[in-house]
Amino acid sequence: MKILVYLEKSDVRGGIEIFAERHVARLRAEGHEVDVASDIRQEMGRYDEIVVHKCSDVSTLEKFPPEKTVYYVHDHEPICPRSYAYTPLKRNCTRPGGLWPCIFCAPLCRNWKPALNRVLSQGRRKRAMAGFRKLVVISEFMKGRLFANGIPAEKIEVKPPVIRAGETGAEDVTSGRKIDLLFAGQLIRGKGVQLLLAAMARMKTPRILDIVGTGNMEPKLRALAAQLGIADRVHFNGFQSNPQDWMRAAKCVVVPSFWQEPYGLVAAEAVALGRPVVAFAIGGLPEACGGKATLVPPGDIDALADALELS
């Protein structure tokens, strides 16, 4: 089969980009002829199937032939103008996206113009999505979100990512130092590292935290660790190309996200590696953990501290 995979350009190689790369490799391994594009200048009529992994522009989305298109919905962006499914009041939002109430939320965004444009084009986006042959999500949680936004249930397929625990790398990632608690991910607000630091400060037993990843919250997190008096127990290791090796070496992997994670790839990988996981029970994280993690109420710092004491 001849397949076109569409993924819009991004300056960041995040989870969606990694997923798309793996998907392309898998399709080619299955014998399909696959082209990858970040524009649609190609003649789409010559393809048997169009796979869309990320498309923020609704005008572009409307150009894909509905009968051939399979749309992978990786996150909340297609149904939330703010993209993260929480309000400017820093609360998670479970309402369907639309002119109401999103028209009041979008102007309060930092990047309010794109958010407002997404509000005004929500109807067009939903109609385009509903017309596609199939929509693929990575959790039952996300299927429920799409259904609440008017997408017919029979068009939504739940396909969790295939997690393969790779072989241990030859490099000793910590130079012999054992890892106690590990956080691996972007240092952005929704990932909840600030809640993890607060929980560490409340624990009776001092623990060491290694952080793998970078992001715009790093300066604030360093300052918070110092303010809480735990800076000597928090190691910022920056971006690492081999996070699975760090997970293998960890006594416990912590996933303190307080936004509604569509799935939770880090949690799933840690479970696949046989590592203990402590996470907030929010969004798709319970599914990603598969009943093999300690889950605590979302945002409950005391409960997180108690769970880490026992990890």
Predicted regions and their residues:
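Active-site donor-binding acidic/aromatic loop of nucleotide-activated sugar
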Residues: 217, 231-240, 246
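Acceptor-binding helix/loop patch of EC 2.4 sugar-transfer enzymes
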Residues: 75-119
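A conserved mid-protein helix/loop that constitutes part of the nucleotide-sugar donor-binding site
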Residues: 18, 179, 183-202, 216-222, ...
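Short alpha-helical segment that forms part of, or immediately flanks, the ligand-binding pocket
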Residues: 244, 262, 267-272, 286-287
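A short hydrophobic beta-strand element within the catalytic core of glycosyltransferases
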Residues: 253-255
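Conserved acidic donor-binding segment of nucleotide-sugar-dependent glycosyltransferases
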Residues: 291-302, 309-311
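Donor nucleotide-sugar binding/catalytic pocket of nucleotide-sugar-dependent glycosyltransferases
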Residues: 104-168
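Short hydrophobic beta-strand element within catalytic cores of glycosyltransferases
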Residues: 276-279
